[in-house]
């Protein structure tokens, strides 16, 4: 069975195709705000609507797949930017109506997790989901991904992006800040706001900007910012590993590309006897393949709707989503 997936939650519009649980391919384009500014939801939506037809035609042509071959259409229903989400939902509905096939609403964060499990072969991992919109440490229990710790305000990627934008390092901010940090040999103290198992990143970007204004060299501030942000996350991961005693950690989301973060998390995993598996770069950022894959899993378990019943949800918690397919992919394991 072929499932087509549409991703449009934020700055990236992407389409992917999955056949019987195997990713055939994906193609996408990213909206880059003019002047390195923040994402304007309406402008991102206009970008997505503009590029969607050509991406669909090009991907299907590359794969040698016809629209009539598609058995279901999945789309990222949330969380995300409302105008951008609606572009993907409208395309999914239109295709489903034309083809007479079901529509599968997919949670963006769950899709990041599932494509990471697919690509790394992880079975029952502790999940570290880190991106521009997510900072969550979670694990499967009783039909859902349960959250052990999360950001109380902005996501780790968003905080670093905001700082990068303000100091002129451009977008995306995480690789730019890490590159800037490479020339620094020292760090300066930063607050580490960890509340129980939860994190607060909003103040880190503000503190970093204050240091720049005081004349602290930019590379030193960059290194201090990323080290603090990553060690805060590592602290929560370590506590979750101690509690769950899981033997696998899967790192998913766009920030998973960070070389320094991989080093820190692998050190934590080694201390607790857990193997840290990082999603490959091709599936780290927002992509249509993860939506198609999760849509395929959901469809097989009867989780789908009609075009008339398909909606978007700008706010949608990860731990409110049922994942009835989890045991299908990991039949022999222990669950917390």
From Swiss-Prot:
InterPro entries according to UniProt: ATPase_NBD (IPR043129), Gcp-like_dom (IPR000905), KAE1/TsaD (IPR017861), Kae1_archaea_euk (IPR034680), Peptidase_M22_CS (IPR017860)
Positions that bind substrate: 129-133, 161, 178, 258
Gene3D superfamilies assigned: 3.30.420.40
UniProt GO cellular component terms: cytoplasm; EKC/KEOPS complex
Entry annotated with the keyword Metal-binding: yes
Subcellular localization(s) per the UniProt record: Cytoplasm
Free-text remark on how the cofactor is bound: Binds 1 Fe(2+) ion per subunit.
Amino-acid positions noted as binding Fe cation in the UniProt annotation, renumbered to this chain: 108, 112, 286
Main location: cytoplasm
Stored Pfam families: TsaD
CC cofactor: Fe(2+)
GO molecular function annotation: iron ion binding; N(6)-L-threonylcarbamoyladenine synthase activity
EC number: 2.3.1.234
GO BP term, example: tRNA threonylcarbamoyladenosine modification
Recorded catalytic activity of this chain's protein: L-threonylcarbamoyladenylate + adenosine(37) in tRNA = N(6)-L-threonylcarbamoyladenosine(37) in tRNA + AMP + H(+)
Domain of life: Archaea
Keywords for the protein's UniProt record, in alphabetical order: Acyltransferase, Cytoplasm, Iron, Metal-binding, Transferase, tRNA processing
Similarity remark: Belongs to the KAE1 / TsaD family.
Function of the molecule: Required for the formation of a threonylcarbamoyl group on adenosine at position 37 (t(6)A37) in tRNAs that read codons beginning with adenine. Is probably involved in the transfer of the threonylcarbamoyl moiety of threonylcarbamoyl-AMP (TC-AMP) to the N6 group of A37.
Protein name, per record: tRNA N6-adenosine threonylcarbamoyltransferase
Organism from which the protein derives: Pyrobaculum neutrophilum (strain DSM 2338 / JCM 9278 / NBRC 100436 / V24Sta)
């Amino acid at each position: 069975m072929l499932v087509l997936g549409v991703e449009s939650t934020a700055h990236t519009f992407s389409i992917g195709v999955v056949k019987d649980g195997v990713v055939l391919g994906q193609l996408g384009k990213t909206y880059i705000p003019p002047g390195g500014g923040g994402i304007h939801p309406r402008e991102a939506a206009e970008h997505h609507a503009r590029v969607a037809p050509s991406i669909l035609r090009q991907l299907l042509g590359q794969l040698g797949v016809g629209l009539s071959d598609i058995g279901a259409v999945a789309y990222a229903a949330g969380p995300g930017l409302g105008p951008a989400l609606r572009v993907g939902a409208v395309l999914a509905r239109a295709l489903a109506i034309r083809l007479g096939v079901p529509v599968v609403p997919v949670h963006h964060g769950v899709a990041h997790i599932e494509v990471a499990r697919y690509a790394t072969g992880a079975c029952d991992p502790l999940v570290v989901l880190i991106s521009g919109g997510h900072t969550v440490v979670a694990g499967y229990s009783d039909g859902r991904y349960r959250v052990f710790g999360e950001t109380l305000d902005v996501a780790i990627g968003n905080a670093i992006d905001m700082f990068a934008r303000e100091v002129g390092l451009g977008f995306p901010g995480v690789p730019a800040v890490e590159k800037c940090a490479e020339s620094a040999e020292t760090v300066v103290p930063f607050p580490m706001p960890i509340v129980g198992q939860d994190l607060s990143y909003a103040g880190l970007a503000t503190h970093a900007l204050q240091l720049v204004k005081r004349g602290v060299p930019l590379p030193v501030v960059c290194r201090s910012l990323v080290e603090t942000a990553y060690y805060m996350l590592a602290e929560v991961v370590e506590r979750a590993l101690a509690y769950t005693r899981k033997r696998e950690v899967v790192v998913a989301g766009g920030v998973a590309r960070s070389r320094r973060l991989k080093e820190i998390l692998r050190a934590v995993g080694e201390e607790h006897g857990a193997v840290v598996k990082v999603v490959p770069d091709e599936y780290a950022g927002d992509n249509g393949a993860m939506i198609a894959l999760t849509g395929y899993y959901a469809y097989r378990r009867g989780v789908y709707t009609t075009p008339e019943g398909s909606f978007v949800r700008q706010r949608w918690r990860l731990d409110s989503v049922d994942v009835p397919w989890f045991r299908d992919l990991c039949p022999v394991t222990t669950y917390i």
